[in-house]
């Protein structure tokens, strides 16, 4: 695209949710995972115990999570010019609970990306695709926060500095 040329209008993917409406261009952004980074999902972990993992119940209970205050505080101190992208492998079916949770804690965010209906890919693959989509939208991913070491490695491979938050969920 040449300087001064209008950017083609992009349709927002269905599994993306803007906080205050879509932006014309992405800009500098910081990416936060939710479960284990912003939300304390520890009381839901029992749904994932062997021999039977109940992902449906695990995600359905996400609206009751406590806030991880120390990480949430980062949202308040980051420069206002940075866009906050919440990138979670939660399925779209729990978007209502997720949005209510974000409202309850009055968290700063610009874009929420959740796993689309019928997407059963591994979290790492889903988030890798999201990184590509964000860049195509014009986002400059400056930093990420993640509790899954596989996703941390993916961000690093993609040239995005990523801070590992130990949630204990993957021990």
Where on the chain are the PLM-derived regions?
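Acidic, Mg2+-coordinating phosphoryl-transfer loop and its flanking beta/alpha structural elements
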Residues: 131, 139-171
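Short loop-to-alpha-helix "cap/lid" segments that border enzyme active sites
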Residues: 122-134
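Non-catalytic pre-domain segments flanking phosphatase-related domains
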Residues: 1-34, 42
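Short, acidic loop-to-helix structural element flanking the phosphoryl-transfer center
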Residues: 53-85, 92-99, 125-128
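Short, basic/glycine-rich phosphate-binding loops at helix/coil junctions
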Residues: 44-58, 107-114
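Substrate-recognition/cap helix-loop segment adjacent to the acidic, metal-dependent catalytic center
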Residues: 76-84, 90-118, 133
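Glycine-rich phosphate-binding loop signature in dinucleotide/nucleotide-binding domains
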Residues: 24-25, 81, 134-141
């Amino acid at each position: 695209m040449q300087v001064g040329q209008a950017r083609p209008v992009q349709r927002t993917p269905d599994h993306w949710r803007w906080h205050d409406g879509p932006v014309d261009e992405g800009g500098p952004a910081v990416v936060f995972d939710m479960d284990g980074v912003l939300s304390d999902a520890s009381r839901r972990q029992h749904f994932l115990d062997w021999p039977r993992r109940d992902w449906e119940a695990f995600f359905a209970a996400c609206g009751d999570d406590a806030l991880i205050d120390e990480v949430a505080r980062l949202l308040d101190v980051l420069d206002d010019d940075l866009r906050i992208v919440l990138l979670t492998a939660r399925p779209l079916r729990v978007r209502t609970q997720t949005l209510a949770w974000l409202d309850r804690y009055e968290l700063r965010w610009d874009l929420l990306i959740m796993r689309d209906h019928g997407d059963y890919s591994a979290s790492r693959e889903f988030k890798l695709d999201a990184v590509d989509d964000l860049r195509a939208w014009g986002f400059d991913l400056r930093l990420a926060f993640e509790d899954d070491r596989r996703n941390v490695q993916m961000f690093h491979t993609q040239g995005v500095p990523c801070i590992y938050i130990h949630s204990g969920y993957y021990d």
